[in-house]
Amino acid sequence: MMKDYEVLKKYFGYESFREGQQELITNILERHDVLGIMPTGAGKSICYQVPAVMLEGITLVISPLISLMKDQVGTLNEAGIRAAYLNSSLSYAQYRKALSLARGYTYKIIYVAPERLMSDEFLSFAKEMKISMVCVDEAHCVSQWGQDFRPHYLHIREFLKEMPQRPIVSAFTATAT
């Protein structure tokens, strides 16, 4: 198995980790839940993308913005990491095709909107797959008190309880207080 710094170099082109990244990655690889609060531009995404490549199974990334999902998936696929997104921008046929490919473990990382988590079809898919990690990107959206709050984030806990084996949970934000 590749080491974390080898994954960093091969897929992201960096020689070394930034401050705080390796500690978060190590904790994830040791199967600990983590919360990463890092400034914008500090490399939060690498903190879950590197372990996602190294862990067996699929990493689900709960993300609030379709544009962010598309950007991340495009960047990952260009780097050679198979990734997809499941959100309202897909037609039903595209969604079904993406799920079918995911069932074959085509993807290491799948970005999903929080509204999708408890849908019957997605929940059924998630239960039959090996979900190694669930990552909450832009985790400040979980807070009921914030202006960015999305009620469906409250279903993450319920979603995790539905999994046959509890995945690692990671959450990242630049704006938690």
Task: Name each model-derived stretch.
Residues 120, 127-177:
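Post-DEXD/H (motif II) to motif III coupling segment of the RecA-like Helicase ATP-binding lobe
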Residues 42, 49, 90-133, 141-147:
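Conserved helix/coil segment N-terminal to the catalytic DExD/H
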Residues 52-54, 76-78, 100-105, 124-129, ...:
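Conserved catalytic network of the ASCE P-loop NTPase/AAA+ motor domain
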Residues 1-39:
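Conserved pre-motif I regulatory segment
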Residues 31-50, 60-63, 172-175:
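Walker A/P-loop
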Residues 30-36, 57-58, 106-108, 168:
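Pre-Walker A (Motif I) flank of P-loop NTPase domains
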Residues 36, 61, 84, 110-112, ...:
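Hydrophobic positions in the central parallel beta-sheet of the AAA+
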Residues 57-79, 88-90, 94, 113, ...:
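Conserved Walker A/P-loop ATP-binding site and its immediately adjacent core
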